[in-house]
Amino acid sequence: MNIAKLIDHTILKANTTKEDVMKVIEEAKEYKFASVCINPTWVKLAADELAGHDVDVCTVIGFPLGASTTETKAFETKDAIAKGATEVDMVINVGALKDGDNELVEKDIYEVVQAAKGKALVKVIIETCLLTDEEKVRACELSVKAGADFVKTSTGFSTGGATAEDIALMRKTVGPNVGVKASGGVRTREDADKMVAAGASRVGASASVAIVLNDAKGATDNY
């Protein structure tokens, strides 16, 4: 298995500098990761630097709380795509899900899917650490109904990250035709292999190089 092609090489910290982003971009070129996942402010730089390379440009929408309005998320998506993003990882409205407002949650995802249609993959971050199993299932079902390409465990900025149990539940819920992304706390090759075995088709990590090189030291970042 070519683990590198399953990894979104990620840097999303608030204090990320241009030098940090360039390092991630160069590593993505060298190790041929699936994508670089960066904050929207870095999308144009990443798109320019990765032109001609088989590495997608992934960014985040409504991140990390998911509490911005649907209209804002749709605009963010269009803006990111205009600047060169080919994948977007959006955060659901977690509070609305917990309120049982399925209509709002689905519309929130649907509008981002429509904004990205034909131009970028949409991954929906459900923030599993804040949800009951019933809520995880419902979030996945609403994501599929709204037309998302992937469901994703975590932002890496909340109270917990990916677990093999959550990945298995999400895979069972969405079936074989929707992607499942494990993110948050995936730091070693062993972590990544566990997630893939449980059903993940993509892994988000900042420790991507350590994972590929099977460096047991891994990394300390949550993402």
From Swiss-Prot:
- Where, by residue number, is the active site? 89 (proton donor/acceptor), 152 (schiff-base intermediate with acetaldehyde), 181 (proton donor/acceptor)
The subcellular localization recorded is: Cytoplasm
**What are the BP-aspect GO terms?**
2-deoxyribose 1-phosphate catabolic process; carbohydrate catabolic process; deoxyribonucleotide catabolic process
GO: which molecular function terms?
A: deoxyribose-phosphate aldolase activity
Q: Which InterPro entries match?
A: Aldolase_TIM, DeoC, DeoC/FbaB/LacD_aldolase, DeoC_typeI
* Keyword Glycoprotein tagged: no
* Record pathway: Carbohydrate degradation; 2-deoxy-D-ribose 1-phosphate degradation; D-glyceraldehyde 3-phosphate and acetaldehyde from 2-deoxy-alpha-D-ribose 1-phosphate: step 2/2
Give the enzyme class. lyase
Q: Mind listing the UniProt keywords for this protein, alphabetically?
A: Cytoplasm, Lyase, Schiff base
Keyword presence, ATP-binding: no
Q: Which domain of life is it from?
A: Bacteria
The record's section on HAMAP family has: DeoC_type1
Q: What is this protein called?
A: Deoxyribose-phosphate aldolase
